[in-house]
From Swiss-Prot:
The chain crosses the membrane at residues 12-31. One of its GO terms (biological process) is peptidoglycan biosynthetic process. Pathway: Cell wall biogenesis; peptidoglycan biosynthesis. The gene is mtgA. It holds the Pfam family Transgly. Its EC number is 2.4.99.28. The lineage of its organism: Bacteria, Pseudomonadati, Pseudomonadota, Gammaproteobacteria, Pseudomonadales. This is Biosynthetic peptidoglycan transglycosylase.
Amino acid sequence: MLRLFLRRFTKALLWFAGGSVLLVLVFRFVPPPGTALMVERKIESWVDGEPIDLQRTWKPWDEISDDLKVAVIAGEDQKFPEHWGFDLSAIKAALAHNELGGSIRGASTLSQQVSKNLFLWSGRSYLRKGLEAWFTALIEVFWPKQRILEVYLNSVEWDDGVFGAEAAARHHFGVGARSLSRQQASYLAAVLPNPRVWSASHPTAYVSRRAGWIRQQMSQLGGDSYLLTLNDSRRAPWAQ
């Protein structure tokens, strides 16, 4: 009985591994039609009895403001061009901070956020964290950094039911994603820790301060030219 269970379990794992690799390879070239988070939001709205129309329009890399690309990296993951999906120094800092109590600090990279938004459900279980690590490793192996950021910008939530840079730009500022100004981009990046509570178009004092800090970081990183580092070769994971 145990042997039969182990055989079936092993077969299921192999099917899952193969299927997930295939899915990641497909999305390397094909725009994902939606995300797991979008499905979750739709289900939540049905359960609450308040249906919402999800807003999302996929835009390729060249049709998204470079300022937004740099702003998101500056605000969310400044080591994005260097790491292989996991920022070990940020993880250590978050663990040390959380041990002191108070608010919980996260350490998710852009790659990890793509993994959980695209493929997984919300939550903090060990199973979900394990699957997040698996999908993060896959996209880091099979996707270039530019593709990871492109998918991120087209899938992240920027208000309740508003997904992706194009929908966010039109929802908050009435312009397309390619026309976002540096200031507008910084406000969109500033609300990403909690986009359903904070608003890029009606910012609180804290969001305005954070947007100002992001603009400073964008300048320190080198502005648009920083995007060229996405093509640089990275050190091997074990050398970091």
